[in-house]
Amino acid sequence: MSLRLTNTLTRRTEPFTPLTPGKASIYCCGVTVYDLCHLGHARSYINWDVLRRFLIWRGLEVTFVQNFTDIDDKILKRAAEQNSSMTEVSERNIDAFHQDMDALGILRPDRMPRATQCLDGIRSLIGELEAKGAAYSADGDVYFAVMKHAGYGKLSGRDLSEQQDNAAGRVADAEEARKQHPFDFALWKGAKPGEPSFPSPWGEGRPGWHIECSAMVRAELGDTIDIHLGGADLVFPHHENEIAQSEAATGKELARVWMHNGMVNVGGQKMSKSLGNFTTIRALLESGVSPMTLRLFVLQAHYRKPLDFTAEALEAAATGWKGLNAALGLGERYSDQLGWPSPAALSEDAIGPQTSPDAEALQALEQQFIGSMEDDLNSSGALAVLFDLAKPLRALANRLERGDEPGLPEADIRNLAPRWQLLRELAVVLGLRGETSGQSNMDDESIDATIAARKAAKAAKNYAEADRIRNELTAQGIELIDKPGGITEWIRS
């Protein structure tokens, strides 16, 4: 694999080399669960879902961790507004988050720790920093001393001395007055009346935002990970502070690669809840925008570039998805009428794309797809391959949908079957699927057993049964990827 990724830390696009060959450890900053997710969240998590899918498709064993921030001032404020509790607000919005991400076909992370579940690790990490002189107590709070960490500012390019000069003579609030430097940040916040609090060596209180992620990365993945993900708005202060506190504690690099997606803009401004110009994922879907249209809209732009949200752009994505969806559904709906082997038979090596009369052209398109994705996740280039594959399939699907004859010689129709097979496989890598798929409640063992039954049916040339099993799994949100040598991999939608 020749994957190259843009590393915010080095400001270069570099070859990706995992810490452990064949494996990748990834941490993605999750949401603060005080409200519904908006389109900016959708963009971020769709982009990183595609990164994960591509790594899996290329044979890596990926461990993907994404957190929930369930202790925060915003959650406390929302709880007060709703006459509720921090826990109740968090639980409601965690449930809503899962519903939204499932609808968009985003694979669930392998683990999703919550800040409230990691308090022991948080307190331990703060204690280590204090023992090393990188943190100090002040009136029940504990702060990280940025001047004690030589590398502070390496991710964002912030200059500490310049910030110190700018702050000189400024009238500070009570918290600023307790800090040794304007960039010092809270690791532990002393308890306030009426707010939830937790015991600690520094008194009752709650953790700061940044230390939560450092503790969860360490607990779930270790001191150093392969890739750390987030939006561009997290570079400073959140990710800068994560690096400082983690590396001050361990003396090791926190992440080899830092990746950040661009923002969604509305009228030239970043979409955000603070500006009030956001559109929730739920509102978009309830307005009739299909989940795959939204996914296609996001993937048409490079993940690092700003994405302008307009009605025209969304309509263009809807048109594009309509054509792709028609092409993807061709083999499922019309294989008998076209005289194609069943979808299960198509996955057999003997009649796959490799032996098609168009084998060279199909292989070139697959390599073009891989090349685009390996070029810093160029999803728009990868989509161009899907549209190229889909063009003759879509035209044929449209004729059949109208009740017309196929209008092609029998040999040409048969030669389109491997093309459809490749389209379906590459679409799974981008998370694009027919929208009748649901969510599976099957456990891994049941899925593996069902796939084994499908493999046995194929070996017995009982392709109708193999197709029935595949369709049953698809209906439950289990996507199958048939590979040469009779290997079948699966992922949950």
UniProtKB/Swiss-Prot annotation:
Gene3D superfamilies assigned: Cysteine-tRNA ligase, C-terminal anti-codon recognition domain, HUPs
Enzyme class (EC, first level): ligase
GO CC field: cytosol
Motif ('KMSKS' region): 270-274
Residues annotated to bind Zn(2+): 29, 213, 238, 242
Cofactor(s) demanded: Zn(2+)
Record: residues binding ATP: 273
Top-rank lineage group of the source organism: Bacteria
Cofactor details (free text): Binds 1 zinc ion per subunit.
Entries under NCBIfam families matching the protein: cysS
Subunit structure: Monomer.
Designated name of the protein: Cysteine--tRNA ligase
Species, as recorded: Parasynechococcus marenigrum (strain WH8102)
